[in-house]
Amino acid sequence: VHLSGEEKAAVTGLWGKVKVDEVGGEALGRLLVVYPWTQRFFDSFGDLSSAPAVMGNPKVKAHGKKVLDSFSEGLQHLDNLKGTFAKLSELHCDKLHVDPENFRLLGNVLVCVLARHFGKEFTPQVQAAYQKVVAGVANALAHKYH
């Protein structure tokens, strides 16, 4: 992902304030609620029958944190996202058979959740920088797909 120095500063500056467990659980939960077909990858998570069930599900929250921990790792390697996410791309492609479009959807949901959490601090410039990053991460995660 090519970001200007200003964009990198905006992304990393805001990310330092993100509560990964909270934002990760909310982002994954919203993905599962808004795009219910994504739930098929989470059969082992128990009750996903309603929005409150999904949003309160401890396994959704835990996996959301795990997802954002990986995203944090990616932010430290913006110049090598494909390398950073190679193993995860392989896992999601070969073993889990996740539709790569879901990575794009989750990235967009994450941007919405960040906007909700940070309000006015999430300026159009910050949003534009994050859109570039989530697109780059989604692209890197889809890299191993044939």
Curated annotation (Swiss-Prot):
Keyword Transport listed: yes
Q: Which GO terms describe its molecular function?
A: haptoglobin binding; heme binding; hemoglobin alpha binding; metal ion binding; organic acid binding; oxygen binding; oxygen carrier activity; peroxidase activity
The record's section on CDD domains has:
Hb-beta-like
**Residues where N6-acetyllysine is found:** 59, 82, 144
Could you tell me which SUPFAM superfamilies the record lists for this protein?
Answer: Globin-like
| Tissues expressed in | Red blood cells.
Entry-linked InterPro entries: Globin, Globin-like_sf, Globin/Proto, Hemoglobin_b, Hemoglobin_oxygen_transport
What range(s) does the Globin domain occupy?
2-146
Cross-referenced PROSITE patterns = GLOBIN (PS01033)
Classification via Gene3D superfamilies? Globins
* Positions where S-nitrosocysteine occurs in the chain: 93
A GO cellular component annotated for this chain's UniProt record is: hemoglobin complex
One biological process GO term for this chain? Answer: hydrogen peroxide catabolic process
Keywords from the named record: Acetylation, Heme, Iron, Metal-binding, Oxygen transport, Phosphoprotein, S-nitrosylation, Transport
Modification sites for Phosphothreonine: 12
Phosphoserine-modified residues are: 44
- Positions carrying N-acetylvaline are 1
- Residues noted as binding heme b in the record, renumbered to the chain: 63, 92
| Protein's job | Involved in oxygen transport from the lung to the various peripheral tissues.
Q: Which family does it belong to?
A: Belongs to the globin family.
The annotated subunit structure for this chain is:
Heterotetramer of two alpha chains and two beta chains.
Q: What name has this protein been given in UniProt? A: Hemoglobin subunit beta
**Organism the protein comes from:** Pteropus poliocephalus (Grey-headed flying fox)
- Which lineage do the record's taxonomy fields give for this organism? Eukaryota, Metazoa, Chordata, Craniata, Vertebrata
